[in-house]
Amino acid sequence: MKTFTPRPYQHLIINHLLDIKRSNVWAGMGMGKTAATLTALENLYLSGSETKPTLVLAPLRVAQSTWPDEALKWSHLRNIEVQPIIGSAKARIAALKNTHASVFTVNYDNLVWLVDILGDTWPFGTIIADESTRLKSFRLRKGGKRTAALAKIAHKSVHRWVNLTGTPSPNGLMDLWGQAWFVDQGERLGRTYNAFTSRWFKRIQLPGQQWSRFEPLGFAHLQIPLALSDVTLSLDAADWFDIDEPIHNVINVELPAKARAHYHAMEKELFLELGESAIEALNAAAKTIKILQIASGAIYSDDNRNWTEIHDAKIQALESIVNESGGTPVLVAYHWKHDLERLLKAFPKGKNLDANPRTLTDWNNGKIPLLFAHPASCGHGLNLQDGGNILVFFSHWWDLEQYQQIIERIGPTRQAQAGHNRPVFIHHIVAKDTLDEVVMERRNSKRAIQDLLLEAMKRK
């Protein structure tokens, strides 16, 4: 366990959550929202200000791994046990019986089930809605089933509420009413959605269409944030980070059980070979190809480059990153061709960085929301900095030069040269307890691959 030293902006989050019972925290990825929120909960439990368990609503991956892992990381959170309520109905019911846990996590898809099964015995005093934009579609009538179920207990049975997101209004101000209702039951933005739109929007009837759209009135962009300001903490990374250095963020994902079994079988073969004879330096990386492919999510099944998908854990993680980016274009580094095929299928609006010069132009003009690039195609002289400041490593490989080159394409120096006063975020999607972690170690230490593999073998 590590010793937690809050950064200045994390102190702001902690104090905000302690001071205001129902509130919003708007802060981007990499700003430590999870650790700060757990720290605030720890303070509330220690002081006796909170005695009931807490429920965290989150996407599946975040509920399953992010919150439990964060609690295990820091020594000051040793008294907080995080229990995910995931899996089969039987597993979820068993999880609810954990009397030692003070924090429970559940994915949004299981909200209706949870509210139904608990009924009048609802035990949670605090709800934390992670990636709270999932609540934007709530309406008092004709809303989604999940938010409707949540609305039944949000104000009647819950006395503390936190909306966490880096992008509160990815599609415009219309996204705010549903989230805000869970904080104050419509006190600030209107008791109903119609009241909200009538006050701050004008309806535009489209010629020849039966439906219309809303456009915010001129004063809406000022008045709506102002109306929420007393219960909202909004943090901009550019105000807190040194924009001269990239901000690295590791996003761990768990391999599903079947994928883990497949991975262990392939890893065992590699380590047997390592134990039988010394692998030459040039051959060491090649021996890890299949294992790293499994960590990424698919594997070639024959010599014709046909492939089989093993899991989609990294796809889910990338979805969260894209949602958190709030419309800011994202550059995604992949390694395997099957990575690219899976990415293009999962994100139809994404585009591969090909040889067509128009692709590069469109990216730098903000016309491509997701650009998939192999690091080998991002050598010297390629300018990607105008298109965005977010880079995601979807899969991992040993080549340090290629790794450094793609970072440099949108890195702080390029951003400054182009006149962009903004930090660069680099997200590494890493499969836990796999060679992904060893590749990450090589990037940090620049040690020989075969030495790192031998060390990894000894740890097993």
From Swiss-Prot:
Residues 14-186 form the Helicase ATP-binding domain. PROSITE patterns: HELICASE_ATP_BIND_1. GO terms for molecular function: ATP binding. It comes from the Viruses. Gene3D superfamilies: P-loop containing nucleotide triphosphate hydrolases (3.40.50.300), Tandem AAA-ATPase domain (3.40.50.10810). Pfam families: SNF2-rel_dom. This is Putative protein p41. It comes from Acyrthosiphon pisum secondary endosymbiont phage 1. The gene is 41.
